[in-house]
């Protein structure tokens, strides 16, 4: 595991974009595992800038997203498809047919999870998986559980996750109660993982990287992966020995 300490959010975003850029340059037809949320927005802005400057070409890149709310259509302004389109896809030359996100409008959970697992498998897996870190240690929507969930599955969101996401909706009642998410096994099968974390995650980042490996802290499983890059600011790393 390699840990890069950065000065602030802008520096963190730049270093994370460096890792992604290197992946795209060395393997133009790579499969990127993408994440949503506030943390990667700065990284995506960096990638857009590099594309617009002629330094990156996404024309052959394929992408798979970690998760999607169940029950939200693609054009809903809080769907993760909408997030990816507005924060990255529309401003780079990626082929939208090569972008993959769980279908939140598929009511049959088993059917959609099986379809998404097959999509990832058909691509040969993920070359670089980008992850954010939830306050309770979740990655994707893999919440603290008694066991590590393996493949893509439908989850009931915890109250803490609903609370964290309600700022994006009119009220907490409007936050979806379920989501489709890649499982821990799928994430761990990525050839390389990039974990990006900001200042308000110091305690959980310490627990994830230095504490016991437990499904109660889903991100702790990353300690077992052989190629993890952590990019975090000084505040996020302040509790690390």
Residue locations for each model-derived region?
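Structural motif
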Residues: 31, 62, 127-128
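N-terminal glycine-/serine-/threonine-rich phosphate-binding loop
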Residues: 1-32
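Glycine-rich N-terminal segment of FAD-binding domains in flavoprotein oxidoreductases
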Residues: 26-52
